[in-house]
């Protein structure tokens, strides 16, 4: 059958109540569910400012037809496009989650490539690539934790949509309305 994306609302015994994000036609009470082990999350990285997404971050330009097919999903970022990565840190630097490792440019907008948000503590930059073109899946840095474990870092981050980000030094308040001309 189709694999439908849903979010667990509550669990009672062996029963799970879910919110399904598309048509539930054909589903029955008692149908089996597969748990991915992940919360509903967004994929962050270079290329997302150039895409047209639906509410589940499907790339609408890759999907055929006027209506989305049930159970059809696309990866939200282009895994083959190369981005000009410019390192900001150097080997030996100490970094923390959300620290800037380097940057790429998308539509004349600099995008920071950061230490993964979900990490905790301080890390040493073991290596960082030279300025050059890389895909979002290429390893651009290797970090070492306090126990000596190496953590490869690429340009992709996943973040649960219902979890607030807390790894920031300052959270500026908006001071100007962003007018898009689009009615929401």
PLM-predicted stretches and their roles:
Residues 25, 48-58, 107, 126-150:
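Mobile cofactor-carrier "swinging-arm" domains
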Residues 8, 52, 100, 123-125:
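Conserved hydrophobic positions within beta-strands
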Residues 1-62, 66-69:
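N-terminal accessory targeting/assembly segments
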Residues 11, 19-24, 37-38, 54-56, ...:
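A structural micro-motif recognizing beta-strand termini
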Residues 63-99, 103-106, 113-118, 135-184:
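P-loop NTPase nucleotide-binding/switch module
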Residues 49, 122, 158:
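A residue-level signal for beta-strand positions that form part of recognition/binding surfaces
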Residues 3-5, 112, 122, 139:
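Well-ordered beta-strand positions in beta-sheet-rich domains
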């Amino acid at each position: 059958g189709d694999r439908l994306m849903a979010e667990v609302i509550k669990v009672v015994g062996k029963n799970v109540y879910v919110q399904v994000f598309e048509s539930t036609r054909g589903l029955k009470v008692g149908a089996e569910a597969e748990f991915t082990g992940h919360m509903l999350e967004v994929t962050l990285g270079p290329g997302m400012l150039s895409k047209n997404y639906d509410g589940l971050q499907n790339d609408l330009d890759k999907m055929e037809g006027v209506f989305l097919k049930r159970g059809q999903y696309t990866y939200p970022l282009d895994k083959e496009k190369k981005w000009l990565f410019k390192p900001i840190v150097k080997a030996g630097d100490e970094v923390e989650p959300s620290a800037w490792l380097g940057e790429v440019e998308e539509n004349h907008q600099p995008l920071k490539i950061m230490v993964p948000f979900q990490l905790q503590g301080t890390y040493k930059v073991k290596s960082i690539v030279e300025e050059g073109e890389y895909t979002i899946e290429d390893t651009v840095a290797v970090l070492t934790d306090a126990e000596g474990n190496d953590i490869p870092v690429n340009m992709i981050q996943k973040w649960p949509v219902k979890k607030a980000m807390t790894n920031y030094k300052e959270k500026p308040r908006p001071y100007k309305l962003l007018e898009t001309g689009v009615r929401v």
